């Protein structure tokens, strides 16, 4: 991958008419470390904010193991990159099929909910799992 001094150089050289990712690994590492060192709770990366594989790999290499996921596609992406990651299915309205697949196929044990109906759905989709 080619590196550029700054965004202006990139635009002048490539003259892109397509989206271009500008990934700054050191900035990702610095931000990740800041959160880990200053936030008193568990730090989760919300995959929906930037599901780019290179960004996620850099976040993982900086020590993040826990991910806020909102779809099966996000679950699949993270498990492909880091199989032993901890996933939190944070979408508050999920289909039974998505819950079941997340639980049985990908080992997701943490689900967000905001009402009794969603709790019932999670229990049904996981066969009344106790974990």
Residues of each region from the PLM?
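A charged N-terminal "starter" segment
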Residues: 1-110, 116-131
């Amino acid at each position: 991958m080619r590196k550029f001094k700054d965004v202006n150089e990139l635009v002048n050289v490539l003259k892109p008419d397509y989206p271009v990712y500008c990934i700054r690994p050191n900035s990702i590492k610095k931000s990740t470390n800041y959160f880990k060192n200053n936030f008193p709770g568990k730090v989760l990366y919300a995959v929906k904010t930037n599901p780019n594989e290179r960004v996620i790999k850099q976040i993982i290499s900086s020590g993040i193991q826990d991910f806020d996921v909102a779809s099966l596609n996000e679950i699949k992406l993270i498990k492909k990159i880091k199989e032993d990651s901890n996933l939190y299915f944070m979408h508050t309205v999920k289909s039974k099929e998505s819950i079941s697949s997340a639980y049985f196929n990908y080992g997701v044990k943490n689900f967000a909910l905001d009402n009794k109906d969603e709790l019932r759905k999670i229990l049904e989709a996981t066969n009344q799992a106790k974990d």
